[in-house]
Amino acid sequence: VALVDAFLGEWPGAQEDRTDPAAPHEAGLLHLDVTKAAQVLGWKPVWTFAQTVRTTAAWYRDRHAGMAPGELCDRDLAAYVTAARAAGLAWTR
């Protein structure tokens, strides 16, 4: 719910809930954990939750407006790498 609310905050306007309460759920609980990546690979987040949602919403909004997916991916990847370099992450050296 927090993710959906954050996304809608980045893309205001009319929305329509098309979920089917009778449809099977993907899983009872989805739990993502980056602990192993952090311990083994030294992974650290580059963007905050808010920045990630903002960038994702912009990608979909711009795609909806007709921009090419490859162009959008290149733009966002460049922004991500720039932020990672600014944070001094080892994989950017």
What are the roles of these predicted feature ranges?
Residues V1-R93:
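C-terminal substrate-binding subdomain of Rossmann-fold SDR/epimerase-dehydratase oxidoreductases
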